[in-house]
């Protein structure tokens, strides 16, 4: 679980996720501020269901995406690529995650957009601070692995 812990520590320090969905052979990507939960290994975000990506997602969809910093040198590149599923939350689950989201991003109190969960099944973390091209891999069905 050391790999997942390293990935989680880095993701908890970031705040913007890019995710992409597909429907009827059409792809679309979006960006959002997120809260990362290390226990569920999931991103939580707010996004309007009437947007192009919201309509393409529906209640649940396959998703792929990235989180990356903006380093000034190649030696400092760090970033995550993932694939998994995105779903719209409801009820107590939505209320609980909205409260956590608003705590991190207080301006979100003004938004009525639904809360979504991105649950990665696979994560690849590139971390050049550990050596050029160093990759850490995690799969939900396999636990932690390193490559």
From Swiss-Prot:
Origin: domain of life: Bacteria
Family that this chain belongs to: Belongs to the UPF0306 family.
NCBIfam families: PRK03467.1
Protein name, UniProt field: UPF0306 protein KPK_0562
Organism (species): Klebsiella pneumoniae (strain 342)
């Amino acid at each position: 679980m050391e790999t997942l812990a390293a990935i989680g520590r880095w993701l908890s320090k970031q705040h913007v996720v890019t995710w992409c969905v597909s429907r009827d052979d059409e792809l679309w990507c979006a960006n959002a501020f997120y809260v990362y939960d290390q226990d569920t290994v999931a991103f939580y975000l707010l996004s309007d269901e009437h947007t192009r990506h919201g309509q393409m997602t529906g209640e649940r969809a396959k998703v792929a995406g990235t989180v990356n910093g903006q380093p000034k040198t190649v030696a400092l590149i760090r970033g995550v690529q993932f694939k998994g599923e995105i779903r719209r939350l409801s009820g107590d689950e939505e209320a609980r995650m909205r409260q956590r989201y608003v705590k991190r991003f207080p301006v979100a109190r003004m938004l009525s957009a639904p809360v979504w969960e991105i649950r990665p099944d696979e994560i690849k973390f590139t971390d050049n601070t550990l050596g050029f091209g160093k990759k850490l891999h995690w799969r939900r069905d396999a636990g932690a692995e390193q490559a």
